[in-house]
Amino acid sequence: MRKTLFSGVALAAVIAFGGSAWADVLVGIGIPVTGPNAVYGAQIQKGAEAAIKEVNDAGGINGEKIAITIGDDVSDPKQGISVANKFAADGVKFVIGHFNSGVTIPASQVYAENGILEISPGATNPQYTEQGLWNTFRTCGRDDQQGTVAGQYIFDHFKDAKIAVIHDKTPYGQGLADETKKKLNELGTKETLYEGVNVGEKDFSALIAKLKQAGVNVVYWGGLHPEAGLIIRQMADQGLKAQFISGDGIVSNELASIAGPAVEGTLNTFGPDPRNNPDNAELVKKFRDAGFEPEAYTLYSYAAVQSLAQAAKAAGSNDPQEVAKAMKEKGPFKTVLGDLSYDEKGDPKLPGYVMYKWEKGADGKYNYIQQ
């Protein structure tokens, strides 16, 4: 029988809907529970639930316990706005989420109007914190940082390569692709192809034929793992030998399941992996013992709750605007990501992006390893 991870938090979620007397602070977790990006939603949910249990076990925030309500945005902007409006109607004070930048940005505007503070573990589009809103925070980096790292890496390691920049037409995917392209162009490298494809597309044979005809030997992908896995697999099937490089949208072991052995050697940017921090060993073991691998955004979500709880304590208040002020002024906060401070926009002051390579481990499984 599979163990329940951090049991007791699920009870809090149920109680929240029932108007419990003890659950004084309601936190919404806005994520894709269903749809192609549900794996990332699960990471954010598990991380937030585990951290909230830790906070509640220690007495809550300023003497008040935290309850949870979960909203499924299905990675769709319109549904994200519906979730945001439901959270506002339910009296949510703080939101952990959303994942997709295209959902997070419009939802943040609803939250700002309703006095709700939002911390996203995964929205990397710069526009999110460039809106001038009081309530926007993230524990991840930004695509203008990530694209700069990717562009420089490609320039340094693939000189004279013919480069294709491909994206999924979303605020995240196209935004990241454009930032990478911008850096390459600044360095004097012109891409051979720049193409957009549709989210949910399954057959990339026409795209791959175009890549082969152009003699492309480096493919940069701005998008998420479902399409990336298919492109990688179909490139191999159609005999295109090109280096595939992407960003933090492919950091899921599902990528290897979709791409198969062709995933070997794939490169992607992401922040330093907090699972490798010895200070997090006990927590990581706890997740694994419960049958959940805390990869990618799990600990970024955990850190979001830690930041929120410590900022509320520093503010001496659970009022979202007071907590937002404390998050910008009272850091650094002790988190699983390290000592975490936020600037005036709500962006984290964290180490930059690093490069990972997908390799086959001794257990026969593929995983992304920091280079």
From Swiss-Prot:
Belongs to the leucine-binding protein family. Component of an amino-acid transport system. Keywords: Amino-acid transport, Signal, Transport. InterPro entries: Leu-bd, Leu_Ile_Val-bd, Peripla_BP_I. The keyword Transport applies. Gene3D superfamilies: 3.40.50.2300. It comes from the Bacteria. Pfam families: Peripla_BP_6. This is Leu/Ile/Val-binding protein homolog 1. Residues 1-23 form the signal peptide. The lineage of its organism: Bacteria, Pseudomonadati, Pseudomonadota, Alphaproteobacteria, Hyphomicrobiales. GO terms for biological process: amino acid transport. The keyword Transport applies.
